[in-house]
C-alpha cells in the first residue's frame, strides 16, 4: 500500500502480475548497508521480490589501480590482467574479477538511491514502453549494473616484459561499453560466480534460420560458464552470428554477468514473420468523444502501426509482414426473408439476441511484405479500410453459396444485393479462428523452409479490452495447436484496460446430456459458445448484461449441440500463449516526452493535479442524444466512476440507484477488484453514507486534495480488508476470499455504456424505489437465480431465488418494456424502440467497456464450472449486475436494516456440498487443492453432468484462488484437457501468489526475466519475438502422470554397421542428437522442482542442460515436454538409451468431440488480388502428435533399412531450388576465357556441370570409407551422370518407351573397369587402329545415335563418357585432366572429331564421332540412351531415368497419381523410371561443426537446357545455416554461367491454399479462345511422324514463352499411362504444368480449361536478399565487376516482396539487347521484376482480343522448343557445317521445309548465311550437343 499515491497518476501499472512495489527496494535501508550486506547473500536464484540488491560479493578486499585502454595492434585479448600486480588479493587464474570505476561517496549513494527508488518505477516503465534513452549509461547507474566482469587469464610474457607496469587493460570496444577511459582509476575485487550469475540473457539474431537445437549448441559452445557483456558478438561455427542484447541479474539489467549453468538464454529473432490481424469489429468505427474524436481505427493506422514500424526500422529488423482484416458479421434475418434453412455452405446460424446468422470475413491486405516498406503497407491498409465495411455488409442473394427462402437459387434481378449485415462486437468476434488460421501453415513449417527468417509472431489488434466469448471447442483446438507449434500471440487492445485479469476467454464447457435436468429446458438444450447466446458483451464496460431474451431451446442447433449440451455456467480462462498490451496514444505521448527528458513531462506514477472535474468512463451515445441534462435527469442516474472504474449499481432497493445512490469518483482508486465495481452495496460504509446527490459528489470531488484522496483510500482499504468473521459464520461451505490485490488497479479508461443499459438501470431504479424493500420470488425459473441479494432488514442466506436488481425477467410482475436496440451507427436494425425506460440492467453488448469475465455467470472467477453451482431456475442468458459481489471482499460491517445508504453484504454463490457435513464447514484449501482452478470446492463434477439441486437453498460458497497448488485438482475431463494451456482463475480477485507463479506463463515462463506488466505495450516482443525457451518447469503431478498419461517405452542404441551413413558413434553423441531432434520439433527440457519431485531425482531441479557430460552418465534422466506429450530419456547400461513417451489420455479421447463440430470452418476470404470474397472450407483440427519417434530415434541411431521414404515419414526439412537459364550478354563472356566459342546453351550446361563437380567433391564419405577411397581416388569418376536432352521429360519418356524396359546401370553408377588388370592399356604402347577397334568393341565406350534439337548424330559418343573410359582402362592415366589431354592428342591424330567440328575434346556433354577411316561398320546403330538388352530380363526398379518422347496426349486421369505415395515397388505392367537421383552431401567440408552435417541432395538426371534444373534438399538434424552457406556458394557459381538459383515451393501453385489459407492463385483467362494447336511431332532417333491429337495448350505455352516463362514441372498426366515415373524425393503429383518466370518471382500454371493460374513466389525475395547480404563471403571476391552488376542471382531485392500488388517496382534498370522479335521480354527477364508487373502486362495482353488474334496468326504450327533467348552470333558460326553426316543420310530423316517454316514463322532468324545458326532460333541451334567440362579448361 505504500505506493498507492504515486501509482495514481497512470493506469499503466495496473497489472495482472506482481506490482512494482513488490520489486522495489525498501527505502529504509541505506545504500551502504545494502552494499555491505551483499556478501552475505549467496543464493544464485534470487526471487524477483527480494528486497535487497546484491551488488558485490565475496571479498571486500579492493585494490585501486589504473586502467589502460588498448587497441588490437597492442593485443587481441579483450582484457589483459597482470596477476603479479595483485598478489595481495590472492587472485588465481579462473577467478572472476569485478572492475568498478572509482566514484565519490556522494555519487555512489545518489546513484544507488536513484536505482532503488525511481529506477524501479520510471526506468522500468521506459524500458517497456518507450525507446532507448539517449545516454546508454543512464540505465546502468548502480555498481551491480555497471560493473565490468572478466575471468582471469595468464598475461602473455611478451606483453609483461614490454609493459611491466601494466596492471589491467581493456580494448576500446569494452571501454566504450562500460564507459572506461584510458588511465582512469578503477577498483578491482574478486567476486563469487554465484553473485554475478545472470538469470536471463537476451540474444538477438537476424537474417538466418536457427532451429532451437542450434541455439542449444550455441550456448554450450560459446556462452556456458563464461562472462558475457551487453553488446557482445557471438559467432558459432564461423557462420551463425548473434548479439547479446540484455543481461538480467535478479530482474535488473546489467552490463555484464556470468553465464551460469542455471542462466536462461532467451533468443529473439529480428527477422521473423509477422501476421498482423486487425479485428474490424463494431467498435472500430466508434468515435473517441472524450479524446481526439477520431475513430478507433485511426489509433491503429496513425498511432500504433507507425510506431511499430518505426521501431522495426530503428532496430534494423528485417521482418516479413502479413496484414489481415477480419470480422464476424451478423445478418438481419428479417432482411433475408425470415428464417432460413442455413447450411454450412452459406451462413452459420449462431444464436445471438435476434437469432441472426453470422459469417466470418478475412481480407488480406499485404502478404509477406518486407517491413521496410511500411509506408506502402499503411497506404494499402487505408485503402482497404474505406471499402471493408461496405464489402462485408452487402449480401448478394444471387450468389450460389447464398440460399434463398425456399432454398433455390434465384436470378440477380429478383434478389439484388442488400445491406443485411453488421459487424459483431469485439467480445463475440472470431479471434480464435483467426489465430488458428494464421498458425495453420506452421503445421507445414518443415516444407519450403525459409532459410532467412526464424520465428512466427501473430499480433492481434482489437478495439476491445481483452475479453472474448468463445466456444470450448475453438479455445481447446486453438490452444492445442499453438502449444504444439511453439508460438505465442500478442494481443494489442485499443480500449482501456478493465478492472479484472486479462486476457480473458469465457466459455462454457460441454457436459454430458442427461434425461432430466434440474435446469429446465434451456439447460437441457445446451449451447456452445459458438451458439452465441444473448450475452452480448460490448467491449468496453466491465458490467454484466443480464439480458434474457431466450428461454428454452431455439431452432438452428447443429448436430454438435444435440449431441453435447453446454454447462450453464461460464468458465473463465487466461491462456499462457497470449500476451496482452494496451495501446493508449496519450500515455504513449507522455512516455515519449519522458524518454526525451522533457522537463515538462509528467513524472510517472505520481499524483498530479486533476485536469477535469468529471471524466466519464462509460460513453452513452443515446443519453448524449436525448437531452440528459433536461427532463431525463430525474429518471436517469449515471454511475460515477473513477480512473476506469465501472458503473456502480445498488444491490437492493434501499440503495436505490437514484441521485443519492452514486459513488464518489474516488471510490475505488487502487484496490478495487472487478466485482467491486458492480454494486453499490459493496462500497465502504463511510463513503456511501455521505452520498446525497451526484452533483454534490462531483463538486466535492473537485475540492478534494490528493492527501484527502489518499486518506480516503486508506480508510477504504482498512474497511475492505478486515477479517470476515461475521460473514464466515453466515456462509455455508465457504471461506473468506483473499483481499483484492493492490496491483489490480483501476483503468484510466473511457468506458462506454449504451442507452439500453442505462434505460434498464432506470427501469430497475423505478421498480426498486417503489417502496418494496424485498424482492419477490420469481415464478419463472432463471439460470442465474442463485445470485441472491440479501433482502432488506434481515439478509437471509437461505433465501430462495431472491430477485436481483439487474436481472431482466419476463415475469408479469415486471413492467413490460422494450429495450432500445440502436445504440450507435452500426446497430442499424431492430424494432423501433418505444420511449426508453430506465433499468439497472446493463446490456454488455452495447456497454462498450472492458467486458469482464464475470459477466454472465456467478462462476465469474475462473472457477471450475462444475465446482460452483449455477443459478438454477434463472435464465442462463441473464445475469445480475451484482453477480460479482460474491467475488469481492465482503464489507466488514453488518448491514443496517433501515438506512437506505447501508450496503448489504455481498451476494454469495452457492455451491452444492458433496456431503451434508460439508454444508457447515468451510472448505480447506489444503484439503482440496486445485492447480488450475481458482475455485476451492468439494463438489466434483458428476458423471451425468448435472448438479445437486440443493442450490435452491441459496448461495453459500465463495471463490478462492489456488493457482499455485501442485496437488491434483478435481476437474472435469474438459477442464483437464484445457488446463495445460488455459488457466482457470477468478478474474475479479486473482491472488497475488497465483500471478507470481512462474508457471502462470506455461511454456513461456522462462522467456520473462521479470514479470511483465499488462497495461504497457510489450515492445520487446513486438520488435523481436522470443523463440520458445529451451527449458520449462511445467510438469504434471505424479498422480496426473500416472493416471492421465499413456506410456510407451522403447530402447535405442547406435548402429555398429552403418553402411556408409552418418551415425553417432557413442551413446553420448546419440543422446545429444536425440535431444537436438526434439528441440527442433518444439520440445523443451523440463527442469525445476516439479519434475524433481515427480521423478524422485533431486538433481533434475538444478539440471545443467548445457553440460552434456552430466547428461551422458549411466542412469542420467532427461525429461522433455511438448503440449500433451512428455518424453523421458534414460541412459541405461549397455550403451543404450531408454525412451518413454507419455501421452495424455484426454488429448485422444476428446479429439473426436472437438473435431466433430469444429473441424470444418467456412469463412469468406478475399486475398490480395481477389475482387470479391469467396467461401473456403478449412479444417481447423488441432495437430495431433502423430510423429513416429521410435522410427526417428532409430533413424538417428543409424537403423534405416525399414524406411523407404524417410523424408516424408519423418518430416524432414525440405526446400526446392531451380536453376533458371538466363540470357548472357557479350561482356559476361569475358571471364569465361577459352569458352568464348561456346554458345549460351553450352555455357548453361557448363554451369550445371560445374555445380555437379562441387557436389561430387563435397559428397559425404564416412570416415571408415575414406581410407579405402583415397587409394582409388585417381580412378574416381563423376557419379552425377546427368543426361541432357532438348525435349521435355515426358516427351523423352514417351519416345524411348520401347527401349527403356531395361535400365543401364552405367547411367547411374560408374562403369566397372571393362578390361582386366592384365589387359590395361598404356599410352605409349597403343596404336590408333587398335585403340579404335577397342573403343568400338563390346568393352569400348558407348556408341549411339543422339539427337540434339532437330539434328540427329549417328554413332557418336559423349566426351564425358570417353574421359571416364580412358581413366578406367589406361594404366598410366590417373586423373580426368590427363584423360582430356590424351583425348586431344588422339583428336589431333584424327581418331575422332566433334560432330560439328567446333570443339576440341572436352570432358562434358559434347558429341564426337569416330573418323571415317577408323569407323567400324555396325549392323544397327544404338538409337537410344539405353543399350539394347535381351527382353527376357527383368527391369530393375531403379532403372533408366532419362527416356523421352513428345507425348502431348492428356488422355488418362490425373487423380490416380496425385495421391499415390511413392513406393519402391513398381506395377507389374509398368516400367519404372527414376528421373532424379539422391546423394549425401556434406555441407560442412571445413569441419566447423562437432558433428556430421549431411543433407540429402536430389538432382535431375534428365535435363533439358531450356527448362529449369531441379534441386531438392532434405535433412533431419542438420544445421540450417551451413545449408544456407552451401546454397549461397552454389548460387555464386551458377551466376557465373548465366544460371539463377531460385527457391520455389515444393508443391504446385494451385495447391497453395491447402497450406497457406491466406493465399490463392490468380486466374487469368484469354479474351479470345485460341485455335486448335498443331499436331505434335512424335519423333525418336529413327523416325519423324505426325501422331497423336493436337496440343490444345500449344498457344498457351507459346504465350508463356513470349513472356519469358520457362518450364518448371510437367503435369503427371503428360507422362505415358503405362510408365511409372518417380523421383528420388517422391512421386510427381502436379495436376497442371507449371512454369516460372526468369526472374523467379512468378509461377504460372495452365489449367485444363485453358486458364492461367498465377502465384507469386514468396521465397525468391528472401533467398536472393540473403544471397546479396552474405554472398561476398562465398566465391564472390574473384567475380568480375560486370558480373556483380547483373540483375541476377545476387542482386538485392531490398526486402521487396513479390506479392501480387502494384506496390513493388524493380530496383535495377539494366539494359540488354532487344530481341529480334522486337519484344522487350529478354530485357525484362534480365532484371528482377516484381510479379505484379509481369502479371499486369500478361493480363493486359490476354484481355486484348486484337493482339491475341495477331499472336495466334503469327504462331505457326511447329514443335515447341522453348529457348533461353537470343545470344550474339560468334565469329566461329560461319565455319561450322550444318551436319557432319552425308546428305543422303540426313535427307532421309530431316526435312528441309521444316527448317524454312520454323525460321520464318519464328521471325527471329537473322539474315545470315544458311550455314550460320542464330542462338535464338528454336529449331536450329548453332551448337551441337554440349554440356561443357566440369571446370574451366585452358585449351589452346
From Swiss-Prot:
Residues 16-31, 962-975 have a biased composition (Polar residues). The keyword Translocase does not apply. It is a peripheral membrane protein. Residues 1-12, 727-737 have a biased composition (Basic residues). InterPro entries: DEP_dom, DEPDC5_CTD, IML1, IML1_N, WH-like_DNA-bd_sf, WH_DNA-bd_sf. Residues 1337-1412 form the DEP domain. Disulfide bonds: none annotated. Keywords: Membrane, Vacuole. This is Vacuolar membrane-associated protein iml1. It comes from Aspergillus fumigatus (strain ATCC MYA-4609 / CBS 101355 / FGSC A1100 / Af293). GO terms for biological process: intracellular signal transduction; negative regulation of TORC1 signaling; positive regulation of autophagy.
